Amino acid sequence: MNSVIDLRTYVSASNSRLLVMVDLQEKNYDELAHDRASDLRRSLENCMSAIRHARNLGLPIAFTRQTDSSESIERSAQSAWISGFEPKRSDMVFEHLQPSCYTNQLFDDIVSQIGSFAIAGLVAEQTCLATAIDASHRGHHVTFLSDASASRGRHDTDARAVHVVTTKAIELFADTVTTRDWLVATSPRTPKGHRHG
């Protein structure tokens, strides 16, 4: 393996104390599934790896979903989770009316206490980007899991190209890593194998 690891990004990723999974809703899945250029299956596999890892480590997980209405009855009908990605009772769930997760005051309060988080999920060109910008303005540290995220195609641009541009834009406000690098950075380190003396 010949990859070079950016030490600053590695250290920053290891400080993630919350995993935020955005917009893992069936309506978003259905929209992305129609765009053959989106790498939806790979993105969801990486989302599941990040979720399992966070649960194994006891890291808190926040699931967010955008809603079109403030009426709770309408929200529940519009916001079904993708099968297999339903939050557990121990997970936090935040709904937001605008693209940024920070439009939910409770989300803002909790992240303000924690200070750093990793983010991934669907509709990255909207929710992940807006949330990363708001986090940066609040002095919070974000790690974007680029391969555990997917973006929608826009106008005459396919989903893959939009996601490349989205990732570059998020890099202005957050650290961007692969899921594998985040898993390694957040895994417990043991002194096993170290020789002293």
Annotated model-derived regions:
Residues 55, 66, 140:
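Histidine-centered active-site/metal-ligand motif
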Residues 15, 33-62:
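A short alpha/beta connector and helix-capping loop motif
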Residues 25-31:
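Short acidic, Gly/Ser-rich segments with clustered Asp/Glu that frequently serve as metal-coordination loops
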